[in-house]
């Protein structure tokens, strides 16, 4: 299973920024490579893009499960777009904060604006919606609240 969070404003490479990350339902491993449209009215309905892909390493002592119970995950990402140190801190219920740690991959550049394409197909959200029969106008806005968390 993929433990998953929705980050409505997308990740920030700026260590001064804190981004809301909402814990969502765990996803099957197959979802790591799913792009397409989930019909409106179904869970996660909307256009789904694989925006980044990679691996992670926990940087805390202890297991992933113990870090989840504590509500603090300290990890490094080794993705095509996101790299370096990150921290997720639970603030209550399903609400977490995602923060970039200060390291050589930190930046004030807006990574979601500068790198908007799928890492699998190089399509934009609107292109995925068009190709898969989804709502192109809604996907074209890039509004993260209109994007399924997959």
What do the PLM-derived regions correspond to, one by one?
Residues 1-150:
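Catalytic cores of nucleic-acid ligases and guanylyltransferases
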């Amino acid at each position: 299973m993929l433990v998953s969070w929705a980050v409505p404003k997308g990740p920030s490479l700026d260590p001064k920024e804190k981004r809301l990350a909402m814990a969502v339902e765990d996803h099957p491993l197959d979802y790591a490579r799913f792009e397409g449209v989930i019909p409106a009215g179904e869970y996660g309905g909307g256009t789904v893009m694989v925006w980044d892909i990679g691996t992670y390493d926990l940087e805390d002592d202890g297991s992933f499960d113990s870090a989840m119970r504590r509500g603090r995950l300290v990890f490094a990402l080794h993705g095509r777009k996101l790299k370096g140190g990150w921290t997720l801190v639970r603030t209550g219920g399903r609400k977490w904060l995602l923060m970039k740690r200060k390291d050589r991959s930190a930046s004030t550049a807006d990574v979601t604006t500068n790198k908007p394409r799928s890492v699998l197909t190089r399509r934009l959200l609107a292109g995925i919606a068009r190709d898969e029969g989804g709502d192109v106008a809604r996907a074209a806005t890039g509004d993260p609240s209109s994007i399924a968390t997959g």
